[in-house]
């Protein structure tokens, strides 16, 4: 053994290939010292079993001098144990290169190089690489890519909007669903799908300051998007020249940005592909004056290609405000308010005619005349068929009208009336006597709405004299929880102090298991509290939340909600109820409202219930009514005679009923049909649920965990604990936490246990693990023994995996047309390709591992025979590669031509189709076809099989 090592020889580490070429420094007794100049690392190995492979190049190989020039080897000499290579450089001149002068940065990543360098991987890794290629290809071609990985129940209208918008180049749309229909999820799906497809790389999210945390939680928990929250402190403390350039997704409060010109300059300079603006209806615009917030968003919309505006419904906004949002998206199309009003008025009769067709299945003469006037003579045949009772013609007519809808491509608005699946609400009021201690409190802002806060804030308040010892709502709550026994109950109150005090009260006075959730806790602490509440067996019966602390959380596995106090605005009340009242809630929402009699609490309850009807139904008019009656409401809460109070209630109720009638009359059923997807969303839901039921992902991930040295153990039903083992292969594996994580593949489990990672094909752990496999050399060589009686012992089969590789920007999405699926070739001794007759899994079941040392000896002995067979493999698969590229070109051309034809025809009748959109699509087609023409065949992996 000792004689095989000579100072100056080049060896490569079998376990640390990333170190580059090593140089033998010394052999001292039983130790061997090797320097790796590329990294400056030195390693000492036991002489008997050093994990090293001798680097030997052969004639035909291309090698690199440490100064950077290359040569093609023609002859190799062994001079005193050192290799000397002779050959030709790039200028075709004869050169000599001793191995001591080889580049230190050579790494054997090509399959053939690694095979002959003795870097042979475990058999399981080869299978892992093959399956990674197959799964990657399938996902890139899937219509669900970017839609199925969200931690939420798949809902038809959300999926339809997400696919429709995210598949556009630089989408510019208004998302105006009614409250509770999931605009934030729709926006997150669009962001996620655009990022995965490469259509967007940098995203800016502008939100009101009070919604920053909610967005942060939603994007991280639901979509695994690592959003950077920017505020003044972070901006000032950053060492970067432009702090915004360091992040892919920035979450910024609009209030701060408007007041900080330096931050504005940095934001404009950073460059963005997509901008999302929440609560866009708060951007004030009038023909003669605009707010600073509106002006800033308008300037950003001029330079950022994609824009998503999340806003209240057009009916709530009013026509002028609605126009203001649309002109942010397309100022050329929406430039004249008067013209927009006229166009909207002209379109209203058409929407009413469609309503008639949908409700009655036929058209009256007046409706027929209206639609004929809108479509012209080209619609006559369709109208005749509709009148003859042709249901297919009715559907076609609706589609024709949808295409011509003035804002149908830029505005998406779903309503609760059109979307089914919401639960019923049941109200349980509990009037309780107001204690004397509260009657003596000084008046202050909302003091009598939240008397416990005022009581505890008194200078002379003592620890012994806690408010929860005399407040009847606490005794009532304890009794209510005992009656409900193990039923999960969510309690929401306005202030964090109240929430923490209530937890103390329940612990001291009842022993009922409770946990608290407030804005003073970090995300990890909130996750633990939410998980404790969600645990059916050992968890808390009650979760007590503050107003702010519960933002962005979903507790719909519970259906009992206690409103310990009432918020000062109807929108906040709707947000509270919305924690449970969501699509997919399977139970009636039981609303428990305790309040103190003859106090402002009682009057606020009456205001919400009798005037706004805000407990039993959503209240789209709440904001308008609060704005209209707020100045009169607040003084009357504290002191007014009953007659004056009742007059206000009656007046507000009448105004609400009038506004609701207006909203109903103004409903645009055609727009609702377009926003709902007319059945397309339902098909996506079905496909996602079917994908959820498959076992391919858990099976694949187990092999991935085994390969990378990740230990997995059962946590509970449908859940696993992952931890790095001592043999962890790569510390960069995206486990998410060095200490370990808990995961589930079950969507329902993930919805109730936010402390668990929801693993789907889109999860960063899955995508990152697959990238580690394919971006490196892992599993691209293997040697195995094949047990098959039909093969003569000693027969050598060669299995080669190729991929059709196209180097192109991700935004072109060429992976959809030419995915990296393996082109497999199985060569026998006579050069015949057996791959079509012997499937991969069939072959895999017949294989046994070979010790690495034995495998290496065999490969070195067979090198001269294997090299020409490897070269012959490319000739075998080249025709299949050419067919695959031709099919990719055909599909790309067909898809883009079809979309161009559709949009061109649409543009003729609907000016919201922008010229820039058509130009971008034509450019994408041209670039895509040009890139596909350059697609090359690459050898991905080699497996040598020896019959035994």
From Swiss-Prot:
Residues 473-627 form the Helicase C-terminal domain. Keywords: Activator, ATP-binding, DNA-binding, Helicase, Hydrolase, Nucleotide-binding, Transcription, Transcription regulation. GO terms for molecular function: ATP binding; DNA binding; helicase activity; hydrolase activity, acting on acid anhydrides. Residues 164-332 form the Helicase ATP-binding domain. A motif (DEAH box) lies at residues 278-281. ATP binds at residues 177-184. GO terms for biological process: regulation of DNA-templated transcription. Pfam families: Helicase_C, RapA_C, SNF2-rel_dom, Tudor_1_RapA, Tudor_RapA. It is an enzyme of class 3 (hydrolase). NCBIfam families: PRK04914.1. Interacts with the RNAP. Has a higher affinity for the core RNAP than for the holoenzyme. Its ATPase activity is stimulated by binding to RNAP. Belongs to the SNF2/RAD54 helicase family. RapA subfamily. This is RNA polymerase-associated protein RapA. It comes from Pseudomonas fluorescens (strain Pf0-1).
């Amino acid at each position: 053994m000792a004689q095989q090592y000579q100072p100056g020889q080049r060896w490569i580490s079998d376990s640390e290939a990333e170190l580059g070429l090593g140089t033998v420094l010394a052999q001292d007794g039983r130790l061997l010292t090797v320097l790796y100049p590329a990294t400056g690392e030195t390693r000492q190995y036991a002489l008997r079993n050093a994990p090293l492979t001798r680097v030997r190049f052969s004639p035909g190989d291309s090698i690199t001098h440490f100064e950077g020039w290359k040569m093609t080897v023609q002859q190799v000499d062994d001079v005193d144990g050192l290799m000397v290579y002779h050959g030709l450089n790039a200028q075709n001149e004869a050169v000599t290169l001793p191995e001591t002068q080889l580049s230190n940065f050579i790494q054997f990543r090509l399959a053939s190089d690694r095979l002959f360098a003795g870097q042979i991987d475990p058999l399981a890794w080869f299978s892992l690489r093959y399956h990674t290629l197959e799964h990657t290809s399938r996902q890139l071609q899937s219509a669900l890519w970017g839609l199925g990985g969200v931690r939420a129940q798949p809902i038809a209208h959300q999926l339809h909007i997400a696919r429709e918008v995210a598949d556009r180049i630089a989408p510019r749309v208004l998302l105006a669903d009614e409250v509770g229909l999931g605009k934030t999820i729709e926006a997150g799906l669009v962001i996620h799908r655009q990022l995965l497809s490469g259509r967007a790389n940098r995203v800016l999210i502008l939100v009101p300051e009070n919604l920053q945390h909610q967005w942060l939680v939603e994007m991280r928990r639901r979509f695994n998007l690592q959003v950077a929250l920017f505020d003044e402190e972070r901006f000032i403390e950053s060492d970067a020249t432009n702090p915004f350039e360091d992040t892919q997704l920035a979450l910024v409060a609009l209030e701060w940005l408007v007041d900080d010109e330096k931050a504005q300059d940095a934001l404009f300079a950073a460059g963005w592909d997509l901008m999302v603006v929440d609560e866009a209806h708060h951007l004030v615009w009038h023909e003669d004056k605009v707010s600073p917030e509106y002006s800033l968003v308008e300037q950003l919309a001029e330079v950022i290609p994609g824009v998503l505006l999340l806003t209240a419904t057009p009916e709530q906004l009013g026509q002028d405000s609605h126009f203001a949002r649309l002109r942010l998206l397309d100022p050329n199309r929406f430039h004249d308010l008067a013209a927009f009003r006229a166009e909207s008025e002209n379109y209203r009769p058409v929407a009413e005619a469609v309503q008639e067709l949908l409700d009655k299945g036929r058209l009256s003469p007046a409706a027929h005349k209206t639609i004929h006037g809108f479509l012209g003579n080209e619609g006559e045949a369709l109208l005749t068929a509709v009148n003859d009772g042709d249901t297919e013609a009715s559907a076609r007519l609706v589609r024709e009208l949808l295409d011509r809808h003035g804002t149908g491509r830029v505005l998406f608005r779903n309503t609760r009336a059109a979307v089914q699946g919401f639960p019923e609400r049941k109200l349980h009021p509990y009037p309780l006597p107001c204690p004397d201690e509260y009657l003596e409190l000084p008046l202050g802002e909302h003091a009598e709405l939240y008397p416990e806060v005022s009581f505890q804030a008194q200078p002379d308040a003592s620890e012994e004299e806690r408010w929860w010892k005399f407040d009847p709502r606490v005794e009532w709550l304890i009794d209510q929880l005992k009656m409900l026994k193990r039923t999960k109950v969510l309690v929401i109150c306005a202030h964090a102090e109240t929430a923490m005090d209530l937890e103390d009260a329940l612990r001291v006075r009842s022993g009922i298991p409770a946990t608290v959730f407030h804005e003073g806790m970090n995300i990890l602490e909130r996750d633990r509290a939410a998980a404790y509440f969600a645990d059916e067996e050992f968890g808390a019966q009650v979760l007590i939340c503050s107003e702010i602390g519960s933002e962005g959380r979903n507790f719909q596995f519970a259906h009992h909600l206690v409103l310990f106090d009432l918020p000062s605005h109807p929108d906040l009340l709707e947000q509270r109820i919305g924690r449970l009242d969501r699509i997919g809630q399977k139970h009636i929402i039981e609303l428990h409202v305790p309040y103190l009699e003859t106090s402002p609490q009682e009057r606020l309850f009456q205001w919400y219930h009798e005037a706004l009807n805000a407990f039993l139904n959503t209240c789209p008019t709440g904001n308008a009514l609060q704005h209209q009656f707020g100045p009169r409401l607040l003084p009357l809460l504290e002191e007014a005679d009953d007659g004056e109070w009742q007059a206000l209630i009656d007046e507000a109720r009448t105004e609400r009923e009038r506004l609701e009638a207006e909203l109903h009359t103004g409903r645009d059923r055609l727009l609702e049909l377009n926003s709902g997807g007319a059945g397309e969303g339902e098909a996506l839901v079905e496909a996602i649920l079917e994908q959820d039921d498959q076992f391919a992902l858990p099976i694949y991930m187990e092999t991935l965990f085994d390969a990378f040295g990740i230990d997995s153990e059962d946590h509970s039903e449908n859940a696993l604990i992952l931890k790095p083992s001592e043999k962890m292969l790569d510390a960069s594996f995206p486990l998410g936490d060095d200490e370990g994580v808990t995961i589930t593949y079950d969507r329902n489990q993930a919805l109730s246990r936010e402390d668990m990672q929801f693993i789907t094909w889109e999860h960063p752990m899955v995508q990152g693990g697959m990238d580690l496999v394919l971006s490196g050399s892992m599993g691209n060589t293997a040697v195995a023994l094949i047990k098959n009686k039909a093969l003569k012992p000693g027969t050598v089969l060669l299995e080669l995996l190729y991929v059709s590789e196209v180097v192109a920007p991700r935004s072109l999405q060429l992976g959809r047309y030419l995915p990296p699926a393996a082109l497999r070739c199985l060569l026998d001794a006579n050069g015949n390709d057996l791959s079509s007759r012997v499937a991969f899994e069939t072959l895999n079941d017949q294989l046994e591992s070979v010790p690495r040392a034995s495998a290496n000896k065999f490969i070195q002995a067979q090198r001269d025979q294997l090299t020409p067979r490897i070269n012959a493999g490319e000739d075998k698969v080249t025709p299949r590669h050419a067919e695959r590229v031709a099919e990719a070109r055909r599909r790309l051309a067909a898809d883009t031509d079809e979309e161009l034809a559709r949009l061109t025809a649409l543009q003729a009748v609907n000016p919201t189709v922008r010229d820039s959109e058509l130009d971008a699509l034509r450019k994408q087609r041209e670039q895509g076809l040009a890139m596909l023409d350059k697609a090359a065949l690459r050898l991905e992996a080699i497996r040598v099989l020896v019959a035994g």
